[in-house]
């Protein structure tokens, strides 16, 4: 099936869905697989061009993350090349190293398991099941976050102080990177898994989300570099790239708005921030499984 079977309305809808769910801890890939199946859309999910099309949308998401965190990336870039003030260089290089450490596990594991995961990508019931698992993972992170903190707790088990992003160690980054590998399974959220990894290392929601969104950029760009060439050489009808470009813009705008909302949300609701997303994933996943089974 050729990619032209996805009409413009479907492409824009998938783009908006991608832009929001890539950052929200609810699994963008899981939604991209499950929702079309629920709506009865005949999308080319079994085509070699479907995943590259989704990654093309990731390019819009990556642009949104780069624009939103441009100060962070400029500080890192200028520090790494020694262009920043001397007292900023060591910290910039240290954080850059942490980003590299956190990114490597997903690159290695993804490279080893790519073909098996491709089969999982095509199955809406499996993605719906792991959406439920994702909800449980988020609840697990919230439940155990206090036990992982080196700081004292109050009588109601709320942590009185949390670690900031600047305190991350190499082991913190590696642990978060290992958690990111779980998101290679459709239905498991990359941002959710990495935020949980940060919480279990005693980092607060806002700092965990900040680091999660920073390491998202190289992962998304890496996936784009690997997949988009396949799209360029696929059997694609005229006009598809115009539709894909429009969809990428829609995904980018949605991703920027989602990032702005989430950074404020995680800052203002540190004691229970993941719970609403957890309940949503469990209910949505169970509902999708029931619909796919009985419909």
From Swiss-Prot:
Protein's gene: uppP
Subcellular location: Cell inner membrane
GO CC terms, sorted: plasma membrane
Topology versus the membrane: Multi-pass membrane protein
Reactions the enzyme catalyzes: di-trans,octa-cis-undecaprenyl diphosphate + H2O = di-trans,octa-cis-undecaprenyl phosphate + phosphate + H(+)
InterPro entries (UniProt xref): UppP (IPR003824)
Organism the protein comes from: Granulibacter bethesdensis (strain ATCC BAA-1260 / CGDNIH1)
S-adenosyl-L-methionine found in the keyword field: no
Pfam short name (any one): BacA
GO MF annotations, alphabetized: undecaprenyl-diphosphatase activity
Name of protein: Undecaprenyl-diphosphatase
Keywords for this protein: Antibiotic resistance, Cell inner membrane, Cell membrane, Cell shape, Cell wall biogenesis/degradation, Hydrolase, Membrane, Peptidoglycan synthesis, Transmembrane, Transmembrane helix
């Amino acid at each position: 099936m050729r990619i032209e079977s996805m009409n413009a309305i479907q492409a824009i809808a998938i783009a908006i869905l991608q832009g929001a769910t890539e950052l929200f801890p609810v699994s963008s890939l899981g939604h991209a697989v499950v929702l079309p199946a629920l709506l009865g859309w005949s999308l080319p999910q079994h085509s070699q061009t479907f995943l590259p099309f989704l990654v093309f949308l990731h390019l819009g998401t990556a642009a949104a993350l780069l624009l939103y965190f441009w100060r962070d990336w400029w500080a890192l870039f200028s520090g790494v090349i020694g262009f920043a003030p001397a007292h900023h260089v060591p910290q910039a290089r240290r954080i850059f190293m942490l980003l590299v450490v956190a990114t490597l596990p997903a690159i290695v594991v993804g490279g080893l398991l790519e073909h098996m995961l491709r089969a999982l990508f095509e199955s809406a019931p499996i993605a719906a099941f792991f959406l439920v698992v994702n909800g449980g993972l988020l609840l697990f992170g919230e439940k155990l976050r206090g036990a992982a903190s080196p700081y004292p707790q109050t009588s109601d088990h709320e942590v009185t102080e949390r670690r900031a992003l600047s305190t991350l160690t190499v082991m913190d980054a590696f642990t978060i990177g290992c958690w990111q590998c779980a998101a290679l399974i459709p239905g498991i959220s990359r941002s959710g898994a990495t935020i949980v990894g940060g919480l279990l290392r005693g980092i607060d929601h806002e700092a965990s989300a900040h680091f999660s969104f920073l390491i998202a950029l190289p992962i998304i760009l890496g996936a784009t570099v690997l997949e988009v060439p396949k799209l360029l050489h696929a059997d694609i009808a005229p006009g598809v790239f115009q539709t894909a470009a429009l969809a990428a813009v829609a995904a980018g705008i949605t991703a920027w708005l989602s990032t702005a909302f989430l950074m404020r949300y995680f800052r203002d609701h540190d004691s229970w921030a993941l719970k609403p997303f957890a309940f949503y994933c469990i209910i949505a996943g169970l509902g999708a499984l029931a619909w796919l089974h009985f419909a």
